């Protein structure tokens, strides 16, 4: 079993995002972890759609999105179009978790 380094980009300095990404990639990061929270499913707010898109445009390593939102299926295609590689959901957050997981797989993403 190998260990992967997956820094959370929620802690990144978004004023210097490209530089942050370069530093983390050159330090050996394997995957960028992107937390999306809607203030409904969980009481906090996390990264927004624009943040995810900006990271995907700059990063050369894999990106994993952790959806802590209600009805995650409605965002799967959007995040896939940005170039994320892995999407995590909470099965109790949507009406049809199996359908959501199938959609992720159909788009060629890991889950």
Features from the language model and the residues they span:
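Conserved N-terminal beta1-alpha1 strand-loop-helix module at the mouth
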Residues: 1-88, 93-96, 103-109
């Amino acid at each position: 079993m190998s260990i992967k380094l997956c820094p959370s980009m929620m802690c990144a300095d978004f004023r210097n995002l490209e530089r942050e990404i370069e530093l983390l990639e050159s330090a050996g990061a394997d995957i960028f972890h992107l937390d999306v929270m809607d203030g409904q499913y969980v009481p906090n707010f996390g990264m927004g759609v624009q943040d995810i898109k900006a990271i995907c445009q700059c990063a050369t390593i894999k990106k994993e999105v952790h959806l802590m939102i209600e009805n995650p299926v409605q965002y799967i295609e959007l995040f896939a179009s940005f170039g994320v590689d892995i999407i995590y959901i909470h099965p109790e957050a949507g009406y049809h978790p199996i359908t959501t997981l199938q959609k992720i797989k159909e788009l060629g993403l890991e889950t």
